[in-house]
Design a protein with these regions (language model features):
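Extended substrate/RNA-proximal surfaces in nucleic-acid metabolism proteins
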Residues: 2, 54-133
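An N-terminally biased module of ancient metal coordination in phosphate/nucleic-acid-related enzymes
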Residues: 1-73
């Protein structure tokens, strides 16, 4: 069983100031035994965190913070992954398009499968949840 953790941490792969390995070392120093890296719209730092976590006995739950919209408000949706689902190439491609604000490209690939809630250039919360499922 885990005793102390943080499930919303950003690394230098988004707007954080520490590399994933530095985050693990700091978590260990602060007696955390479980964390999740949830960078904005990418999963690039997770492998580094998992490797460093194993060295330091800190469990790492792979995660991401997806940028979406609800009406006129920005809403971040957190997704947490079992095993290595975060390495899925389609997911990585979609996250890259969200990061580069190329929602039109996502619409072309998924328009018949996902409801985009009337947005043309943004992801609604509902779409974000479907993508992370």
């Amino acid at each position: 069983m885990y005793n102390n953790g943080d499930f919303h941490i950003h690394s230098t792969y988004s707007d954080g100031s520490l590399m994933p390995s530095q985050i693990i070392n700091l978590a260990k120093k602060w007696d955390m035994d479980i964390i999740s890296i949830t960078d904005h719209n990418n999963t690039d730092g997770i492998d580094e965190a998992i490797i460093e976590g194993k060295k330091n006995n800190v469990a790492v739950i792979p995660g991401v913070e997806l940028s979406t919209r609800y009406k006129d408000c920005r809403v971040h949706v957190w997704g947490y992954f079992k095993e290595d689902i975060y390495k899925n190439e389609l997911l990585k491609e979609v996250l890259l398009k969200v990061k580069k604000q190329r929602i039109k490209d996502i619409r072309r690939g998924f328009e018949d499968k996902i409801d985009f809630c009337g947005f043309k250039n943004k992801l609604c919360v509902q779409t974000g949840v479907v993508i992370l499922r």
